[in-house]
């Protein structure tokens, strides 16, 4: 497919996703909104597959089939009352994907120099940081909604200072990552990843189980911004648009 066709397909998908959000906002149009979302995703996947940038089909297709089958089984088995749990665990997948895309993007494009390197590294560290919080926070939210983790808030002494310390630590190591190359840069990025995972756990553990539906909405927003960051790293316009839609709607 030519770049023009791919861009057109992505634009159509973006419009369908917007229509999907509009349809899902009301019960009487929810079914139609869901269909819009399905159609938009099918177009996006096909456009990406035939973009000429995908080569390892022998690995990709089986993984897509496995994911599709697992998703269909979960959607069929999960009761509507347990839908927040399913949404929470799906958010964790988005966060994990953003972390892996960020690390892989750095390893593939570590030879950037100058302004290009700075911009790319900022995209990477933001994607990894937001993705890490989304992943670990969503796993905890899933556990609390399911009852596997106590719904009682875990209120550690000085928890706000601890959160601030982790945030400042992430900024420091992110700065070190941007201003380093090779193994030191990778080590700093992995430290940011670890801090974000711990921060996600600590943030959600401090919230009671009764407030988890609100937390899921917040994590929905986080997953959107993580996807948008991944879109910048992959230079994928549709991923940026979709991530921004999800992030703002969350």
Regions found by a protein language model. Name each.
Residues 80-136, 140-159:
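Interhelical loops and loop-helix junctions of multi-pass membrane transporters/channels
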Residues 16-29, 68-87, 138-153, 199-212:
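C-terminal ends of transmembrane helices
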Residues 1-57:
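N-terminal transmembrane signal-anchor/hairpin module of polytopic inner-membrane proteins
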Residues 1-14, 51-69, 120-135, 182-195:
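Structural signature of hydrophobic alpha-helical transmembrane segments
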Residues 48-61, 73-84, 99-115, 180-181:
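Transmembrane alpha-helix boundary signature
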Residues 31-40, 60-63, 82-94, 153-163, ...:
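Cytoplasmic-side transmembrane-helix entry/capping segments in multi-pass membrane proteins
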Residues 10-23, 41-48, 95-101, 105, ...:
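Helical transmembrane-bundle signal
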Residues 104-114, 179-184, 214, 222-241:
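Transmembrane helix-loop junctions at the membrane interface of multipass transporters and ion channels
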């Amino acid at each position: 497919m030519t770049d023009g066709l791919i861009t057109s397909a992505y634009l159509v998908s973006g419009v369908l996703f917007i229509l999907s959000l509009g349809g899902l906002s009301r019960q009487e149009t929810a079914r139609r909104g869901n269909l819009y979302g399905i159609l938009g995703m099918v177009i996006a996947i096909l456009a990406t597959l035939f973009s000429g940038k995908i080569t390892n089909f022998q690995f990709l297709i089986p993984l897509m089939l496995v994911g599709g089958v697992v998703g269909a089984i979960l959607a069929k088995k999960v009761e509507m009352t347990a839908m927040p749990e399913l949404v929470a665990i799906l958010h964790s997948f988005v966060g994990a994907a953003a972390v892996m895309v960020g690390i892989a993007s750095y390893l593939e494009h570590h030879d950037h120099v100058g302004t290009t390197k700075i911009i790319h590294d900022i995209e990477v560290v933001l994607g990894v940081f937001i993705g890490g919080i989304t992943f670990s926070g969503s796993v905890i939210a899933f556990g609390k909604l399911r009852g596997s983790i106590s719904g009682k808030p875990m209120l550690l002494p000085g928890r706000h200072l601890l959160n601030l310390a982790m945030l400042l630590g992430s900024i420091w190591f992110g700065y070190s990552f941007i201003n380093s190359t090779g193994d030191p840069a990778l080590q700093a990025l992995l430290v940011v990843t670890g801090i974000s995972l711990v921060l996600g756990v600590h943030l959600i553990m401090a919230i009671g189980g009764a407030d988890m539906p609100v937390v899921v909405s917040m994590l929905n927003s986080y997953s959107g911004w993580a996807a948008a960051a991944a879109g910048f790293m992959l230079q994928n316009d549709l991923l940026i648009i979709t991530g921004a839609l999800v992030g703002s709607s969350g």
